Amino acid sequence: MDNKIVYVVSDSVGETADLVVRAAMGQFPFAPDIRRVPYVEDTGTLKEVISIAKSNRALICFTLVKPDMRQYLLTEAAKEGVEAYDIIGPLIDQIAEITRQVPRYEPGIVRKLDEEYFKKIEAIEFAVKYDDGRDARGILKADIVLIGVSRTSKTPLSQYLAHNKRLKVANVPLVPEVDPPEELYQVSKEKCFGLKINPEKLNHIRKERLKSLGLSDGATYANINRIKEEIDHFEKVINKINCQVIDVSNKAIEETANIIVNAVQNQRMF
């Protein structure tokens, strides 16, 4: 038996229709000859496909979300004696009836969702790779650069922005004994956000951190004078960069993230 030609017609890439057709044709002992026709936007293209399908005695399977395009293809194919199968239309109509919601009728939704998912994964991987100043090269690649002393929520904030806002975030810890990476002075100051914290608040946070690790809270790490020294160093660096500073002393991560996102959006508007 000759291979049956199937024209897969779509207003997007056509992956959904292609997969469904291959799954169905897999139930038969002959290889399908699938010819994809993607990104169909006008009835002229549909008319041409119908004509070719008629001459090849082919089947048309399609995923067109716009009702007028779907109806045109079904009507014109029937006039020409061409079999046309609507893969997605009846399901959209059924869901609309059950939910009493109006469909968006927007082509390529699945692909757009996939792209958003991969952007999120890419942002999360970026945050891990360039966490805690591990690789200064990330500073110049980042959408956002967080700067602060230890225990100012740089890491969880980086992950939150990556996971929820799909932003690539690098974070840089500051200590007096180590010069900040040169990249910190090369990146646009609009991308940088200094995370400021009250010395007493930081003192409490660090003591609790040491206790959770089974260490003495009298270590230099939690010493108030040491903390003030670190904050002084932080302020000198931030003043040199001249970037926005956010006081995170009494802010939840979500609140700080919203401030950053709003600042970024405002910058893009001007």
From Swiss-Prot:
In short, the EC number is 2.7.11.32, 2.7.4.27
Broad enzyme group: transferase
Sites where the protein binds ADP: G148, V149, S150, R151, T152, S153, K154, T155
**Catalyzed reactions per annotation:** N(tele)-phospho-L-histidyl/L-threonyl-[pyruvate, phosphate dikinase] + ADP = N(tele)-phospho-L-histidyl/O-phospho-L-threonyl-[pyruvate, phosphate dikinase] + AMP + H(+); N(tele)-phospho-L-histidyl/O-phospho-L-threonyl-[pyruvate, phosphate dikinase] + phosphate + H(+) = N(tele)-phospho-L-histidyl/L-threonyl-[pyruvate, phosphate dikinase] + diphosphate
- The answer to keyword NAD applying to this record is no
As one GO molecular function, the record gives: ADP binding
The yes or no answer to whether the keyword Kinase is present is yes
Report the domain of life of the source organism. Bacteria
Transmembrane spans: none
| A matching Pfam family | Kinase-PPPase
**UniProtKB keywords:** Kinase, Nucleotide-binding, Serine/threonine-protein kinase, Transferase
Family from the record: Belongs to the pyruvate, phosphate/water dikinase regulatory protein family. PDRP subfamily.
**Role noted for this protein:** Bifunctional serine/threonine kinase and phosphorylase involved in the regulation of the pyruvate, phosphate dikinase (PPDK) by catalyzing its phosphorylation/dephosphorylation.
Protein name in the entry: Putative pyruvate, phosphate dikinase regulatory protein
